[in-house]
């Protein structure tokens, strides 16, 4: 029955596509055509014709998922009477049929030829043809590139000896850059060389140099597919009436700091100097100017920066004025919140104090106090039915490396911050009382030119103290023979975690790699025996009468974004994480264990509903504690498409699971085994909607189970072939994209 319903829905959808496709020709004027499709191809084998598609001026109507012209179909459902709101609405959210324009086609043909010539195909041609069917038309552009031109020789004609010396000094350092004999002759390559020389000279004091002073002469008369290239650097001329001279090389005489707000700049002189990449007595540098802007932009105490230069008459000296506008140094905020945990209602308040210039170095002090109260229902055998939580956190963010062992030049070249934090969390529940004390010291820095950012947790301490556990909770969950669970018990004991971690992120817009590694308890594990630490009944070493955790954890994730056109793209994602407890720990702390399912994982399952392995929870229900693991695998493919207005759509396939590295009796079927794990990979599919407001995205995903490793029967294991909405459906709401 369920399969018949799906077939029926698919049939209705196909009928809708056919009807709207036919009705769209109603909007095509007589003797004109609907642009049904645009094709671009080449008569030269192996030539990437699709890469030149952006040069085509008139495109056919957009398609959802690169298949269905739903926007045009929606528009076609409207009537011509725009006084009716239904017609106006359909036309607004839809897309008007594209009427073929001969002029646009001829201009596109010309643009394609120019693009081919710029790519080195100097004798390229582009032919154009059309195919008509009824009121529809297919436009076909055929590229005839011919043979590309190559550079036979490169010569530089530089009449300014000072510039000649600068370029000569740079040549050994950048031997792989610039124009070279044997390389393709393209406009892009010439532009790159023009930009390279201009940047080099602007960074070497030639304040008034610009790329128009560089011209190229190409001689191809003696070669059929080769050119002899001359790069000319013209001398300086201020204007058409001014004499021709050598290019002036400017030096910075003084740097002066002023306040936009007519108030004193409340930053230490050393901070101003540290963030100013420009240096008195050195040649002007455009790169150092940009770096100075970036340095001051990252300071929380500064609102914006304006840098101006003044020439001293009849000299090559510059005076630099750095004008700073300062932020309000202190802010206080009060934020009430409403909470809803599994139907239990509550309230919370958050008080925040922030000082953006604590030590006159743009250090940010943040103090947060949070209190929460929740009335818990459905608990039996407990005296108290309320949940209370209080949290206090103090954090100082320094906009630089706090590391005296690092060289001054290393610290200046990187955008970095150092963070020190302390926090205390108090939780009183009917079942137990928990206290958590945390402290951390970490660095963050980035290399924007290489698309890299780093995080180093030099030390991260967490002390968990359980001052009280109710007798009812002990009897029912911790001490009961039938419910004796090592994973559960471990998470209701006093525990000390001492972490060192490192993470790196690479993101160039198309490829993203995130890698993290952390080790916990290794320093303590190394000194426990030599220093004579005592052991508890479980054989674990104790510090201050508390056992410490010991494990290593590593994660890596890779995402690839493939754009087919401005409206359609494919996102591919792979994630792998492994955590191994050893030494002083046999079980990972609950907060460090992996879980699967949810909005950012395998979306056919709710959060913490999947795994580990073929484990399916107690009595088939979600088992909050046991459905966690030491290893996680995620594989995702998501096709993203533009729908209309701010609404985007997605179709996805997810696969993955979690596993344990040890065989825990509470998690039968959960251990990772090389000959079994691939049979336990869960698969889901679904559709999603995204509301893209630019600064944030609201995401709604609807997933269905396709392969469920928790079951062995064909009907439940291969849910794709036997779909059951009640059993297999999962809905997710989240902010931001999943990867």
Language-model region placement:
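Extracytoplasmic gating/loop element in the C-terminal half of outer-membrane beta-barrel translocons
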Residues: 318, 569-652, 660-664
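Outer-membrane beta-barrel "beta-signal"
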Residues: 691-694, 725-739
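Outer-membrane beta-barrel initiation region
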Residues: 241-412, 490-498, 509, 596, ...
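C-terminal motif of bacterial Sec signal peptides marking the signal peptidase cleavage site
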Residues: 18-21
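Transmembrane beta-strands of outer-membrane beta-barrel pores
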Residues: 338-340, 357, 369-375, 400, ...
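Extracellular loop and loop/strand-boundary signature of outer-membrane beta-barrel proteins
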Residues: 338, 377-382, 426-427, 485-491, ...
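Transmembrane beta-strand segments of outer-membrane beta-barrel domains in Gram-negative
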Residues: 203, 331, 382-577
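Interaction-mediating elements
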Residues: 3, 23-298, 305-307, 317, ...
